[in-house]
């Protein structure tokens, strides 16, 4: 029977090729490596607390005293004081709008008697009479309102700081006058304030009007001492100008930089290619029924050109929020039906995880300001033929949805060997023409994209667009930040096993019971068990070796060597002892033997606490004394074989773990029985024991002494149809003594007859056992 595979594994699991041992030792070898951090490192170890480095925010901090700037000609901004630091006599500045405002300020040194001096203002030679009888400098504001008029002295500033100010604000020109340290402001009217420009002949500063009190302080008391050192060098005014630059489609921009970290903005155009994955599962039987048509994640790798450079990209497409439909053509075995098929519609989402080999994805750990803009794409379904044995084939055809970009987040893609930090693009859906239908059925004019043929023969769907993100990366491009989701080979294997476990568990509903019992009666060996995997004979042999190497460490294999001694010890304990014996390593844990049969009920409470150990011992006992009846391991092995054949993810690396886990975890709730004359003694893993008569199925007291004696001499039988199911079957349908005996012995032919008759009680029991075959 099918459980032969487990007995073969128990027998051969200790024979392992030397090559496999050497390979295992090599993979487990470790080596200490000392890395020279280089001359610029301050420590050999990575920082315990990773800092974010310099952070740019949206707040602009405007300096109070901006400058000094070199002499120049420009149009001063409105609301800003121009503070001019005069260092010699002569013209300090000239300002005009060439319409109604001309003014020039000339500096006169202390102790100057009245004298006529020549000045060049606005390209003209002018003679002004000046005088200064104070100890401070005088700044004469010469003004005219027309190019035809002569200049006259409108205001005078007497200053020891040699600072002059001019401001454009409120439709007027403001300047300082009076004597420091009590100089004040005054203004002049003009009809054209915006066009007023200035020619500055000395170093100057720029101060916002919001800081006018500071400007007043500087005029009256002088600049801060630091501004009067030789280390302050005036710059060109052009250095103050902000260069507004729009980011290009494909550009890497350094935003900020510190000694260890820098912020990089990556702007890239991308081409996203993806395809849908699907799974179509056909039910067993005559071939007219399908179990499931569903979407599944699909990977796609491709190359494309970006600005003349070839890019290697990897995408994973998955769906969320699917809608479940079904079609049932009738109750007859030859009526076409689909138990469940998935359709994506307006309430669904499509996720596409994208990665490429550009620098943007190299250190994608600390990311902000993530944005994207993508085009839409229409996905149209194709045709799928339901190949029936006889008659015209139904055809699922059509269906369409349009994908619209709805957001982007960070994600992780898993390949066979590595994990990739990726961008997950989320798409919302709208249904589109054409509708889909199943030809030759009543299913017509439905909208959405069914999972039967979502790619419609296309290798991929394509979306173009661009994304932008700011990533915190090491300043030295030779370093990489630790990828939080990077995995070792073993961790990746765990991920594969997790996916495979989920797939295995989901396949339980797709196993046909009639085929399962037929498969359970076959003598499955290594080759037939693994032949469902697409591989060569050599690979199957290698798989068998790998399975045996893994299986020898299983709980089942390590328990087999102790079984015989345990059973012998249990028998002697039951026959000799009149007091409680507790030995965890032996089957004496079965009972608390008592000479007083009336105390059997009390002893059952102790039995219930030890059934986990009991079931393991009885399982091993059953495997050695196999009867003609079907066992739990026959069903377990048959389900394992069926799921291996159905699985799309099974492989050489995952098969050993799956087979070993199946031997330990499939059907955890088991019942075993021992048959003696017309009495049956049964025990299950839930802590319950039963003793009953075959003829009437009426319970009798459970004799622990008798059970302990029989367990070493009588065959142990898997209670495929347990006592509760037998009782239910007899109460509702009535069964003969022969039928009851065959069900107690787990006769496969009788089980098959009940299932073929669609007996709901037997069918439900077998279905529950299949559903217990989970990892």
Curated annotation (Swiss-Prot):
Site (Cleavage): 230-231, 240-241, 246-247
GO biological process: permeabilization of host organelle membrane involved in viral entry into host cell; virion attachment to host cell
Transmembrane portions of the chain: none
InterPro entries: ConA-like_dom_sf (IPR013320), Rota_A_VP4 (IPR042546), Rota_VP4_MID (IPR035330), Rota_VP4_MID_sf (IPR038017), VP4_concanavalin-like (IPR000416), VP4_helical (IPR035329)
Motif position, YGL motif: 447-449
Disulfide bridge positions per record: 317-379
Residue numbers covered by motif KID motif: 643-645
Locus of motif DGE motif: 307-309
Region: Hydrophobic, residue numbers: 388-408
GO cellular-component term (any): host cell plasma membrane
Spike body and stalk (antigen domain): region residues: 247-478
Family per similarity comment: Belongs to the rotavirus VP4 family.
Name of the protein in question: Outer capsid protein VP4
């Amino acid at each position: 029977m099918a459980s032969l595979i487990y007995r073969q594994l128990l027998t051969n699991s200790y024979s392992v090729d030397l090559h496999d041992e050497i390979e295992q030792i090599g993979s487990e070898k470790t080596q200490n490596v000392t890395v020279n951090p280089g001359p610029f490192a301050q420590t050999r170890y990575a920082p315990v607390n990773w800092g974010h480095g310099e952070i740019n925010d949206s707040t602009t901090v405007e300096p109070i005293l901006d400058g000094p700037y070199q002499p120049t000609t420009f149009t001063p901004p409105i609301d800003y004081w121009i503070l001019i630091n005069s260092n010699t006599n002569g013209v300090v500045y000239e300002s005009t709008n060439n319409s109604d405002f001309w003014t020039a300020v000339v500096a006169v040194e202390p102790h100057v008697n009245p004298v006529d001096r020549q000045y060049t203002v606005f390209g003209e030679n002018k003679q002004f009479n000046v005088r200064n009888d104070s100890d401070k400098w005088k700044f004469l504001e010469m003004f005219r309102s027309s190019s035809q008029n002569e200049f006259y002295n409108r205001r005078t500033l007497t200053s020891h700081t040699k600072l002059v100010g001019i401001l454009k604000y409120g439709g007027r020109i403001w300047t300082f006058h009076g004597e420091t340290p009590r100089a004040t402001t005054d203004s002049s009217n003009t009809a054209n304030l915006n066009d007023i420009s200035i020619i500055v002949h000395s170093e100057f500063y720029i101060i916002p009007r919001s800081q006018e009190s500071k400007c007043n302080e500087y005029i009256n008391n002088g600049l801060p001492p630091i501004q009067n050192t030789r280390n302050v060098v005036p710059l060109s005014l052009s250095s103050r100008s902000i260069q507004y630059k729009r980011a290009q489609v494909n550009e890497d921009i350094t935003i900020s930089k510190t000694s260890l970290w820098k912020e990089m903005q990556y702007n890239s155009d991308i081409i996203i290619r993806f395809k849908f994955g699907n799974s179509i599962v056909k039910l067993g039987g005559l071939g007219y029924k399908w179990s499931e048509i569903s979407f599944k994640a699909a990977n796609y790798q491709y190359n494309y050109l970006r600005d003349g450079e070839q890019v290697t990209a990897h995408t994973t497409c998955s769906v969320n929020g699917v809608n479940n439909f079904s079609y049932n053509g009738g109750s007859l075995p030859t009526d076409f039906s689909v138990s469940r098929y998935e359709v994506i519609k307006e309430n669904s989402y499509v996720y596409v995880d994208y990665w490429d080999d550009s620098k943007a994805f190299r250190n994608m750990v600390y990311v902000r300001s993530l944005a994207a803009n993508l085009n839409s794409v229409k996905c149209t379904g194709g045709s799928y033929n339901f190949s029936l044995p006889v008659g015209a084939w139904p055809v699922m055809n059509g269906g369409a949805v349009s994908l619209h970009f709805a957001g982007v987040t960070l994600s992780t893609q898993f390949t066979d060997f590595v994990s990739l930090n990726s961008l997950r693009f989320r798409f919302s859906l709208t249904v589109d023409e054409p509708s889909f239908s199943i030809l030759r059925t009543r299913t017509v004019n439905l909208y959405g994209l069914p999972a039967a043929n979502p790619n419609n023969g296309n290798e991929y769907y394509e979306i173009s667009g661009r994304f932008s993100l700011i990533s915190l990366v090491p300043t030295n491009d030779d370093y990489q930040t630790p990828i939080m989701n990077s995995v070792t080979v073993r961790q990746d294997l765990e991920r594969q096993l997790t996916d495979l476990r989920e797939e295995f568990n989901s396949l339980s509903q797709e196993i046909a019971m009639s085929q399962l019992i037929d498969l359970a009666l076959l003598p499955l060996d290594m080759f037939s068990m693994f032949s469902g995997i697409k591989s060569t004979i050599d690979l199957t042999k290698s798989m068998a070796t790998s399975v045996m190497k893994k299986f020898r460490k299983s709980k089942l294999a390590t328990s087999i060597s102790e079984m015989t001694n345990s059973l012998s010890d249990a028998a002697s304990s039951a026959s000799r002892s009149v007091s409680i014996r507790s030995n965890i390593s032996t089957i004496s844990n079965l009972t608390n033997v008592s000479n007083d049969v009336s105390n059997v009920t009390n002893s059952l409470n102790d039995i219930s606490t030890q059934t986990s150990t009991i079931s393991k011992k009885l399982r091993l006992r059953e495997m050695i004394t196999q009867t003609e009846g079907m066992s739990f391991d026959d069903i377990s092995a048959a389900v394992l074989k069926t799921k291996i054949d159905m699985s799309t993810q099974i492989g050489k690396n995952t098969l050993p773990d799956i087979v070993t886990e199946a031997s330990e975890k499939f059907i955890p709730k088991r019942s075993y029985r021992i048959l003696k004359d017309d009495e049956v003694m049964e025990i299950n893993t839930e802590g319950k024991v039963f003793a009953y008569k075959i003829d009437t199925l009426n319970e009798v007291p459970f004799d622990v002494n008798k059970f302990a004696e029989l367990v070493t001499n009588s065959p142990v039988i898997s209670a495929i149809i347990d006592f509760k199911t037998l009782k239910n079957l007899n109460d509702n349908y009535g069964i003969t003594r022969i039928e009851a005996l065959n069900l107690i012995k787990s006769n496969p032919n009788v089980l098959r007859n009940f299932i073929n008759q669609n007996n709901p009680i037997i069918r439900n029991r077998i279905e529950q056992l299949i559903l217990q075959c989970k990892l």
